[in-house]
Amino acid sequence: MNENFICNKYFVTILIIIIIILIVLLIVFLTKKNSRIERMENIDKLTFAEKPWSNTQDADTYKIVDNDFDKYVDELTKLLGNKNRAKRKDEVYRDYIQSKPINKNNQQTKNTPTPLDDRPDLSQCQPCICPNDRYIPNSESSENDNHLDREIRKKISELGSYVKNKYKR
């Protein structure tokens, strides 16, 4: 009897009709979900949701317009933001305002840099001396300026070698 029921022409036609109806409903549902608004499938919906042109302090993040597209984009943006755990601008600002400020005493005591050694000469920043730097006089070059230039370069190189030798590790 089971073979007769499966091979019955009415059962087969009803099964084919049900499959066709399911395929049509699936196609309609998928196309309707992708383009709820006609001719706006390729538009980035997130740009419509922001309100950058508002200069008022009481402005909301989302523009309030009685347009169906604006309401759709607002709801879509809120859903995407909640799905990705992203905060909106007004939520970030509210968190910033409600956050506790850092106590100045804690900031001064905990974040001060400490010297590497107990030696006071190493705790200070040493001057940076580059041997390629040279003194360039503002006036026209003369023998006196060249002589000063040579003396300055000599002192810089002596100081550089002194610093290198003293603080070798």
Swiss-Prot record:
Residues 100-115 have a biased composition (Low complexity). Its main location: membrane. The chain crosses the membrane at residues 10-30. It comes from the Viruses. Keywords: Membrane, Transmembrane, Transmembrane helix. It is a single-pass membrane protein. Residues 98-123 are annotated as: Disordered. It is found in: Membrane. One of its GO terms (cellular component) is membrane. This is Uncharacterized protein R305.
